[in-house]
């Protein structure tokens, strides 16, 4: 099996530091890292919205963590990564183009939770991205898959919506703009 062992160069788009706008909880962030760091302290999320990834990470190290952070951080990362690829179809296609390669967030800064350093680590970011890639692949083939409507190019409303549509402020999924959850956040 092929392996992608660093999210740099050709594969920089896989990194949370990659500059790609993402809507999360009704707020537009410049990158996934800013959205993730903001989720640590929900009352201060807007402070992170315009920050670069390095600045967001620095600020995220100084905030008081929400009490349930250790139990919710993996689900939050999953939601934010899904939002990134559903809201940026060009990146979704690039993720699909990685084929069946194992995605490893290799690093030298010692992150053994989200990545792998010196051959050791849990690689949660890589695992999340591979799951999203599998869902994207399934959605292209299976009209019964819940993601088919969003990524496969068909929308039940018949409105002609395509990936890259209006992000729902409540759940970060995409809709044609008629989503009741989306409309309730305006």
Regions found by a protein language model. Give the residues of each.
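Charged, low-complexity intrinsically disordered segments
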Residues: 1-186
């Amino acid at each position: 099996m092929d392996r992608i062992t660093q999210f740099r160069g050709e594969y920089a788009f896989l990194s949370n530091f990659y500059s790609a706008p993402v809507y999360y909880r009704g707020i537009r962030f410049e990158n996934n890292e800013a959205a993730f760091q903001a989720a640590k302290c929900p009352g201060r999320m807007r402070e992170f919205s315009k920050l670069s990834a390095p600045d967001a990470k620095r600020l995220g190290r100084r905030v008081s963590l929400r009490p349930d952070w250790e139990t919710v951080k993996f689900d939050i990362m999953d939601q934010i990564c899904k939002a990134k690829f559903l809201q940026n179809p060009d990146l979704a296609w690039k993720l699909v183009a990685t084929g069946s390669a194992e995605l490893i967030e290799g690093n030298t800064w010692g992150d053994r939770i989200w990545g792998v350093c010196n051959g050791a680590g849990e690689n949660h970011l890589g695992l999340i991205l591979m799951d999203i890639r599998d869902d994207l692949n399934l959605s292209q083939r299976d009209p019964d898959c819940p993601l088919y409507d969003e990524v496969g190019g068909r929308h039940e409303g018949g409105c002609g919506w395509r990936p890259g549509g209006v992000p729902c402020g409540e759940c970060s999924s995409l809709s044609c703009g008629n989503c009741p959850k989306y409309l309730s956040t305006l």
